[in-house]
Amino acid sequence: MDEQQDCLHPINIKKFNDSPLTLSFKNITSKVTCNKKNKNKVILNDVSGTFHSGRLTAILGPSGAGKTTLLNILAGYKSKGVTGSVLVNNQPRVAHDFQWQSCCIGQDAALLPLLTTHETLLIAADLKMSSKISTKQKQKIVSDIADLLGLQKAMDTRVSKLSGGEVKRLSIGVELVTNPPIMFFDEPTSGLDSVSSGQVVSHLRNLAQGGRTVVCVIHQPSSRIFDMFDDLYVVANGRIIYGGPVSDMVAVFQSAGFKCPHYYNRADFALEVASCEIVGDVDSLLEKALNHSQTSILTNNTNVIDENSTEKDSAVHEGSSRSSSDSQKKFEKEDSSSVILPIDQESEERKIPVHKRQTYAISYWRQFTILLTRSSTCTFRDMQLATLRLIMHGLVGVALGLVYYHIGNEASKIISNTAFLFFILLFIFFANSMPTVLTFPQEAAVFQRESLNNWYSLPAYYFSKIIADLPLQMLCPTLFMLVSYFMTDQPADCFRVTMVWAVCVLFTIISQGLGLLAGVAFDPQLALFVLPAATIPMLMFSGFFIRFDELPAYMHPFSYTSYFGYGFEAIIQTVYGYDRPKLICSEPFCQFTQPSRYLKEIGIRYTYKEDLMFLSGFIVFIYILLYAVLKFRLWKSRW
């Protein structure tokens, strides 16, 4: 315990003009529809309670008891099928205000693995704090948070190289930059050993003692960790059977006939009571918990933080991004030498009418530039994947060139050359869509966490992601196409090369867009099946395996949905159209020495420009759909 406290490096600094908040919930009931008959399953049943500032509160209970559901409701992430009320300082919670007043850190610490600890914290500060705050002040804030959470030695270490405990602490630090008075944690010790778990909870306790309302869903804590909590709520079958100080739990349980053995872990004892493994009067516990919650809500005694405690235990900084422009000016006038601050007095910012507050701390353009820089850094820093993609495009281009070597000008090998041109599209599609299916879900989880905690807007992230991917999207097909194109002796006219290159780039964008769409819409395992399966019809109606005019009439509408068809038509027209001279015939008879005759034979439907317009239309449609799915994912996470 002493070693853990030594890691915290408490900083004595001046107070932050912010008022502590007490969070109350009353008669919360949550139901979900569990089958086609619209039968409702009760997850939470009329639960009430109060979380006080300055105290570290644990929510404990067996699996399926409703702990995480309660946390999501209180954090504002879930509203569908929920009744009851949530109060902040005995006033109804205002959703817009609560986004600035709270943050929620999930069980899985979703962070970008290619950024360093320092970059992660600094980008969080840039996104969550006003642009009026200087870089020097932000650097000071980042440094103080690193000191507070014991991350100074890992500042130049990539997230992928951090230990589990360091990742957990970093996930706390990125939210800490805005000094939220209410913090929610879903199983912050999951996946950690006992020492790392103790360090994390010790940090949370210090944050609470700085004046925050800190609430944790916890699962089977050790006795030492359990003793760090001030208050406890025990949830069983959707009901709260205990809510109050940890020190009173054993006595309350004993009064209801549940006796805790000597030298027994009180957390295990509470779980056994909640799981009905110990015989006693559960109804008595429910009644006591109800009476306690009603008394607590009525009195709603806001804890006043002891002066000595607030000076000893630090929280975050005085330049909270949730403050208005007036409070930002006030921050700039204050001494910036100490920026890690406990919550204390009434904030002028909260006196400003809600409609005058900004939705985000910085402008949309500023969000876009920061996110674009971050995405570009991650894209080019992932050299293993980027290099592998480039090497594979080059090697496959060479292999394809060797297989179809110098057939591009041979009339007798025109069918084989057509297969080569189709294979270009086939390789580009799978080489650019499949890797994205595996890599994007991790980034999407980071986006979801940051967006739910009000870091930035969806459009800013969306456009930064698209633009950051463009350089690699253009470089890979360019390398592949140029190598294979000239090795196979295709026409070297500059306009033809440019036209084929344009089709390849557009097809790459389509492919990566579909990979992003599958990655965000499905689990990775399911996406790996769905994407190839959905591609099969596109290949069938491409015009390569069967001519369009030979399709049954009822199949014609489906042929218009094949992006492979438009890409194939565009390339084949570029290579054999535009008055190309006669091909070389090395055999006694060649049917298609005239390229125009071959184009007529295979049944070209549209001009090159029309095919490019259709491909561009597919790009617009796919990326609009991607935006809609991302927006739906955010909406669903709040339900």
For the regions a protein language model found, what residue spans apply to each?
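Topological signature of polytopic alpha-helical transporters
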Residues: 1-41, 45-48, 53, 62, ...
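Conserved ABC transporter NBD signature motif
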Residues: 49-52, 75-76, 82-100
